[in-house]
Curated annotation (Swiss-Prot):
This is Malate dehydrogenase. It comes from Cytophaga hutchinsonii (strain ATCC 33406 / DSM 1761 / CIP 103989 / NBRC 15051 / NCIMB 9469 / D465). Belongs to the LDH/MDH superfamily. MDH type 3 family. Its EC number is 1.1.1.37. It is an enzyme of class 1 (oxidoreductase). The keyword NAD applies. The lineage of its organism: Bacteria, Pseudomonadati, Bacteroidota, Cytophagia, Cytophagales. Substrate binds at residues 82, 88, 120, 151. GO terms for molecular function: L-lactate dehydrogenase activity; L-malate dehydrogenase (NAD+) activity. It catalyses: (S)-malate + NAD(+) = oxaloacetate + NADH + H(+). Keywords: NAD, Oxidoreductase, Tricarboxylic acid cycle. GO terms for biological process: lactate metabolic process; tricarboxylic acid cycle. Catalyzes the reversible oxidation of malate to oxaloacetate.
Amino acid sequence: MKVTVVGAGNVGATCADVLAYREIVNEVILLDIKEGVAEGKALDIWQKAPITQYDTKTTGVTNDYSKTANSDVVVITSGLPRKPGMTRDDLISTNAGIVRAVTESVVKYSPNAIIIVVSNPLDVMTYCAHITSKLPRNKVIGMAGVLDTARYRAFLADEIGCSPKEIQGMLLGGHGDTMVPLPRYTTVGGIPVTELVEADKLNAIIERTKNGGGELVKLMGTSAWYAPGAAAAQMVEAIVKDQKKIIPVCIKLEGEYGIDDCYLGVPAVIGKNGIEKVIELKLNAEEKALMETSRKHVKEVMNVLDGLPQQA
């Protein structure tokens, strides 16, 4: 299996490293527009192989998409990261142009690839890649829910004092302030989280999760990369190993949850065909209202993208 990671910044390089270290695929191509960056990071990852014992070959290239030909999966991480004071939506104009150009090059050389979008604003960049690629919706997937849910689980693990592996949870909706928490679907070792965490503390964790990316931007001066890179690699693994794993991903909704033509995070079965099935959870009135708020926000930003010049 061959996977291409476009963008050799922090997130892209981390994704490539995880794919190699865990031997998820046979070959990783790391591509970047900046001369030498992808080559250097890929070489560094490959030189780690004798130490940490893996065989996945990593190769870096500078803006030569012919070297990515016949990739099974392509992860798009290209774009500007957030700076303190910025929202994800502030990145739309610049990153839309980048994602559009990258997607066109990707499908030219790997027309059958499944595309995973990591660039922000995530939901709208998934829309951008989807309409540019003209691929079926099951083959263009946004990485958001995996990361948001991981942050939620990590915060809960700290509060409860348990392993994060014991926590199962799900977050829906947009990637950002309008994400939809589902505490009643959250369990800790099979125990409902509401039995272990008081309501006010649980609400505080939910709010912290919503601002999880912003918290890291304030601390580091730029966007996170370890968890996002690992989250993208987990999605790649589910696809190339045909795991039929149920994880929250951003996808174009076509009637699910009563929503049409909008890109939102929902749980789905992920396998060799990308999105194999969308899981529709039964939402209560409050959750439906939050989902509608999320839909409205994402749709507004989609409309902004529609109004941008195509060469933006």
